[in-house]
Structure formats: C-alpha cells, structure tokens
UniProtKB/Swiss-Prot annotation:
Localization of this protein: Cytoplasm; Nucleus
Alphabetical keyword list: Cytoplasm, Nucleus, Proteasome
Function: Non-catalytic component of the proteasome, a multicatalytic proteinase complex which is characterized by its ability to cleave peptides with Arg, Phe, Tyr, Leu, and Glu adjacent to the leaving group at neutral or slightly basic pH. The proteasome has an ATP-dependent proteolytic activity.
Subunit structure: The 26S proteasome consists of a 20S proteasome core and two 19S regulatory subunits. The 20S proteasome core is composed of 28 subunits that are arranged in four stacked rings, resulting in a barrel-shaped structure. The two end rings are each formed by seven alpha subunits, and the two central rings are each formed by seven beta subunits. The catalytic chamber with the active sites is on the inside of the barrel.
Family the UniProt entry places it in: Belongs to the peptidase T1B family.
Keyword Coiled coil attributed: no
Protein name in the entry: Proteasome subunit beta type-2
Primary localization class, coarse: cytoplasm
InterPro entries referenced in this protein's UniProt entry, alphabetically: Ntn_hydrolases_N, Proteasome_beta2, Proteasome_sua/b, Proteasome_suB-type
This protein's GO CC annotations: cytosol; nucleus; proteasome core complex, beta-subunit complex
GO biological process: proteasome-mediated ubiquitin-dependent protein catabolic process
Gene3D superfamilies from the UniProt entry: Glutamine Phosphoribosylpyrophosphate, subunit 1, domain 1
A Pfam family reported for this protein in Swiss-Prot or TrEMBL: Proteasome
Organism from which the protein derives: Caenorhabditis elegans
Length: 199
C-alpha cells in the first residue's frame, strides 16, 4: 500500500514517502505518519513495511549510526550507511528477529562530492548508487515515466516536477487513497524539507 520515491543526480537527491498508515490492509488509520529517519546531517532513510518493524528498525538504525559518529568523531558516508542497513537486515533474516522493511537511503557524500541513492528490501537485496528508485506497488507505474524523462543533468525544479508526475500517476492509477507525501532534498548545502504533496 505504501510508496517511496527516490530521484538522484550528481548534485542532489530527492526522497518522498507517503504519510498514510493502513490498518487491516485496507483502512486508512492515519494520514500524518512520518516514515523518515535522519541518519546524519546530509543523510536520511525512508522506511516502509510492517508498522512495528518500521518503527523499531528505523529507530535502531538511527541510534546506532549516531553512536558511531559520537565514538569516532565523524558521520558515516551514504554508501557505508547503505551497507550497514543491508547487513543488519541480512543478519536479521538469519535470526528470529527479522525486520519486514523496505528502505530508500539518500544523502550527499562530501568526500566523493556527489549525491547517493540506494535501496534495501526486506530480503536484504541492496541496490546502491542508482539514478531513481521506488518501493511499493505504485513504483510499477513510474519506471516507464523515468525511463523516458530522466536526465542525469536535471535541475532541482525538473527533478521535483518529475517526482510530482510519478506521484500524480500513482494517485491516478492505484486503488488506495494515499492522501499526502513528505518530500526532502539533500545536496551539497545540506538537508531541506520541502512542502508536502497533498491531495
């Protein structure tokens, strides 16, 4: 039912997550659920899945990466965070405490001087450094749009317009009513929260 969108160029990454909470698979219980977990100053994670798993895994990941930065005096890079999340989910699969979550990780790597976008699913399949990614059923409607219209040198305005086009297509074609999306952008200057996309 949920939907995550990620678009990346060399200069920025845009992430959007729906704000809905569904109960019993079909009842809209809440339209203000925040699925974002800030992992650093220029690093964030959007997480969907079983509600309890999302809350526990998201908070656990956030606190572990904060602890790492306190102990070592620096934050992990986006690609390191991606590997940490993938390994954590993979280790959970081999125990009784596995997490049924799908995540998008976006950030800006100051060392490599470029944006990062990656994903990990609930089976610990990881995709790193991708131009665009989706999680959730609605993504099936959007890959064709991206294949046709994505350009690696898009401006922020063009990237946001493309993201809005994908969200609009999901709204038009998906059976569930997803009332709004939280949108963030990360670039060299840092993290910014943009206005929510509401319907």
């Amino acid at each position: 039912m949920h939907f995550l969108v990620g678009i990346s160029t060399e200069n920025y990454v845009i992430l959007a997550a729906d704000k809905a909470t569904f109960a019993y698979g079909a009842i809209l219980a809440d339209s203000e659920n925040d699925k974002e977990y800030r992992l650093g100053k220029k690093l964030t994670m959007m997480c969907i899945g079983e509600e309890g798993d999302v809350a526990q895994f998201g908070d656990w990941t956030k606190r572990n990466l904060q602890l790492y930065s306190v102990r070592n005096g620096y934050e992990v890079s986006p690609s390191c965070a991606h590997h940490f999340v993938r390994r954590s989910i993979a280790e959970g699969l081999r125990s009784q405490d596995h997490y049924t979550v799908d995540v998008l990780i976006g950030g800006y790597d100051d060392k490599e001087d470029k944006a990062f976008l990656g994903s990990v699913d609930y089976l610990a399949n990881g995709l790193g450094q991708q131009p665009y990614l989706f999680r959730g059923f609605c993504g099936r409607f959007c890959y064709a749009i991206m294949d046709r219209e994505y350009k690696k040198d898009m401006t922020e305005a063009e990237g946001l317009a493309l993201m809005n086009k994908c969200i609009g297509e999901a709204k038009r074609r998906f059976v569930a009513n997803i009332p709004g999306y939280k949108v963030v952008i990360i670039d060299k200057k840092g993290y910014r929260k943009l206005d929510d996309v509401l319907f």
